[in-house]
UniProtKB/Swiss-Prot annotation:
Cofactor note: Binds 1 [4Fe-4S] cluster per subunit.
Pfam families linked: PAPS_reduct (PF01507)
Gene name of this polypeptide: cysH
Stated name of the protein: Adenosine 5'-phosphosulfate reductase
Protein keywords: Cytoplasm, Iron, Iron-sulfur, Metal-binding, Oxidoreductase
The UniProt record lists the keyword Membrane: no
Length: 236
């Protein structure tokens, strides 16, 4: 972290993000992450759902030992926790696991069981959105694995943008990638992926709110199936 980075105001960071979004639109994912590493240093992190470790792997090439933030909601598939543990063991990253203030049992006691079925927005707010806001407090910029081809709600994702909700630079280095691009990178670099991706799941979230996708459905159709909800609140 440099003095210049520390002294940037919110307006300066916002202008930086908007300018970088334009200038880096045609850059490669690795070039985007190298820019992030050079610009923000240890005030930059990657968030990962442990669906795969592609962005974490890319970021480790740009900034060895980079912080990789993982939200343990208490509802994850065992395969997801296993992927996190494997990433921590074999990759040059520093995995930071965030947890909600309440355990699942404590939440059940206050709000009743299966809040995810009755009020999924509140459940996501308690177990994802709030913990991430607290966990990102010390960073200026964070990277995600969002891709434009995942759903209509993500079709306009910038490679670098401004996260108005959190007042941070938000970087989506693989926004322009297709699922085929992801698979090519995984194969070429031997990147860890969640075993559920080969078991019918195209997008992996909390176990109670995730199902396998059907042929012809978009990648996120298995999330909160049967509801209009398509995002947990972390990205929109």
């Amino acid at each position: 972290m440099t003095a210049v980075q520390e002294e940037r105001t919110t307006e300066e960071l916002k202008a930086l993000a908007e300018r970088a979004g334009r200038e880096l639109e045609d850059a490669t994912a690795l070039e985007i992450l190298r820019w992030a590493a050079e610009t923000f240093g240890d005030r930059f992190c990657v968030t990962s759902s442990m669906e795969d470790a592609v962005v974490a792997h890319l970021a480790s090439r740009a900034l060895p030992g980079v912080d990789v933030v993982f939200l343990d909601t208490g509802y994850h598939f065992p395969e997801t926790i296993g992927t996190r543990d494997a990433v921590e063991a074999v990759m040059d990253v520093n995995v930071i696991t965030l947890t909600p203030r309440q355990t699942v049992a404590e939440q059940d006691a206050e709000y009743g069981p299966k809040l995810h079925d009755r009020d999924p927005d509140l459940c996501c707010a308690l177990r994802k959105v709030k913990p991430l806001e607290e966990g990102l407090a010390g960073y200026r910029a964070w990277a995600t694995g969002l891709r434009r081809d995942e759903s209509e709600t993500r079709a306009n994702t910038p490679v670098v943008g401004w996260d108005e909700k959190r007042g941070k630079v938000k970087i989506s280095p693989i926004a322009k990638w297709s699922q085929e691009d992801v698979q090519t990178y995984v194969t070429e670099h031997g990147v860890l992926t969640n075993p559920l991706l080969t078991d019918g799941y195209a997008s992996v979230g909390c176990a109670p709110c995730t199902r396998r996708v059907l042929e012809g459905e978009d990648a996120r159709a298995g999330r909160w199936a049967g509801r209009s909800k398509t995002e947990c609140g972390l990205h929109g």
